[in-house]
């Protein structure tokens, strides 16, 4: 753990604070701010943010909403911070939970509500999800805007608690107890339209952001996403032959370097938001404004090329043996499809448990050619402390910091866990990784890794894996924390 001298030393000139996947949990975000050393609250009510000093930058890694009663207030805070300090110091990333709310304007429109429940399709990426008609029948519910929204949240958006979380937040914002179902629906739809806090967040956000040698995205930079930008005409549906991302075996790394890729992804976001405003409801052919952004966060719509929703982590770590086996099996089927034309765009969906290869040397080489030495992501939970891949010679460091399922027994699924990630140094091009926080049981941990390529003293075991598949995640009071697992099952071992 850090020495007293280190704790008392002045902060480095450059500090990039990072937090991700807060998902409307305002209490968690406030805990982060108080501990960050990068952000501070400017008011007693803790609603206005400011930087600790002029050397600070901040990245919010996406997924601002869904699983707490602070969606609106968190988005307002983050948008306000961006307005006051600018995008050269504040980067807000889009996550799947942020982008997929653009669906509300079309799917809850009067025209859509006129469609009989029996004719409303289920989510194209999940055949197991109940259709709207079956949902209403199973719960003896009438066909209303509110109940359609409840079905969407529970079975197509993965956030069954959001309806009541929003009701609770509206009560706080309005200082009144009488918040109707229609009020909740109006709020959810209104939040993605001008004047809405989520809309403000999206308009100030990026798909990818770069500070010096560190690249930030929500999901993953892998062999499928690197260099790929969806076409503006990409539809939110199962991918088809002839789509820009077809075939899935094609590499796009030769088409753009990292900076051009970041620029074009962010230009697509800006265009897609304008398109959503211009065409917020369904057209006769089933398309809608912002289709390309809904596709961007939906793996099968872009043939497994979603930089927003692809993910590395498995079993709480960078990778696992079972993940490698699944990845090899899925790719064998994909390559077989190359000879027969029998591709399945859903081969890379979360339902197949597919995860990307964070150690792909071709991707690392592509990143390094543009000067990127570190990739930082969220999206996929990694237990109760971040997962780390150390940069081997010629490689890239990867940090994964979503701990939103740190304590599944806790009401908020986080418990006492906290992640405070900072990338710091004398120069934005050469920053070290420093992560401090607490595990689900409240025990503290620390991760200190020098800038990639730096020979400074460090715990060389951090971010490495042993022969039995145990990854070293952090230094704790009594030794090193190791973990291994499969899927979302994680086991831990504390070693001296």
State each model region's role.
Residues 2-496:
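Feature recognizes metal-dependent phosphohydrolase scaffolds
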């Amino acid at each position: 753990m850090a020495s007293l001298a280190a704790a008392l030393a002045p902060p480095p000139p450059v500090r990039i604070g990072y937090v991700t996947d807060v998902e409307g949990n305002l209490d968690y975000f406030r805990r982060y701010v108080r501990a960050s050393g990068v952000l501070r609250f400017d008011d007693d009510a803790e609603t206005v943010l400011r930087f600790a000093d002029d050397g600070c930058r901040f990245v919010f890694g996406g997924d601002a909403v869904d699983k707490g009663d602070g969606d609106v207030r968190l988005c307002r805070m983050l948008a306000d911070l961006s307005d006051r300090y600018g995008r050269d110091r504040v980067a807000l990333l889009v996550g799947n939970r942020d982008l997929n709310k653009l669906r509300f304007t079309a799917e809850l429109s009067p025209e859509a509500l006129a469609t009989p429940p029996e004719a409303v399709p289920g989510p194209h990426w999940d055949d197991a999800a109940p259709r709207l008609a079956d949902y209403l029948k199973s719960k003896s519910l009438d066909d209303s805007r509110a109940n359609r929204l409840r079905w969407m949240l529970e079975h197509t958006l993965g956030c069954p608690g959001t309806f009541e979380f929003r009701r609770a937040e509206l009560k706080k914002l309005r200082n009144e107890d009488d918040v109707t179902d229609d009020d909740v629906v109006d709020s959810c739809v209104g939040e993605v339209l001008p004047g809405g806090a989520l809309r403000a967040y999206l308009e100030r956000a990026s798909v990818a952001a770069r500070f010096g040698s560190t690249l930030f995205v929500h999901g993953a930079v892998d062999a499928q996403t690197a260099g790929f930008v969806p076409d503006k005409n990409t539809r939110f549906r199962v991918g088809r032959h002839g789509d820009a991302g077809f075939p899935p075996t094609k590499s796009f790394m030769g088409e753009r370097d990292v900076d051009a890729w970041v620029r074009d992804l962010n230009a697509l976001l800006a265009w897609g938001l304008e398109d959503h405003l211009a065409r917020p409801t369904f057209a006769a052919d089933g398309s809608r404004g912002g289709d390309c952004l809904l596709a961007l966060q939906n793996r099968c719509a872009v043939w497994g090329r979603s930089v927003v929703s692809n993910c590395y982590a498995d079993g709480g770590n960078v990778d696992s043996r079972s993940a490698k086996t699944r990845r090899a099996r899925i790719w064998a089927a994909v390559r077989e499809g190359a000879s027969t034309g029998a591709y399945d765009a859903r081969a890379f969906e979360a339902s197949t448990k597919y995860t990307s290869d964070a150690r792909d040397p071709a991707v690392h080489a592509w990143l390094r050619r543009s000067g990127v030495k570190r990739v930082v992501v969220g999206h996929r939970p990694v237990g109760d402390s971040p997962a780390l891949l150390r940069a081997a010679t010629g490689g890239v460091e990867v940090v994964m910091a979503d701990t939103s399922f740190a304590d599944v027994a806790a009401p908020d699924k986080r418990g006492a866990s906290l992640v405070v990630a900072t990338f710091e140094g004398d120069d934005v091009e050469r920053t070290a990784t420093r992560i401090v926080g607490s595990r689900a049981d409240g025990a503290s941990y620390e991760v200190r890794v020098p800038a990639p390529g730096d020979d400074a003293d460090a715990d060389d075991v951090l971010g490495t894996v042993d022969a039995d598949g145990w990854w070293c995640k952090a230094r704790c009071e009594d030794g090193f924390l190791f973990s291994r697992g499969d899927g979302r099952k994680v086991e831990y071992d504390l070693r001296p």
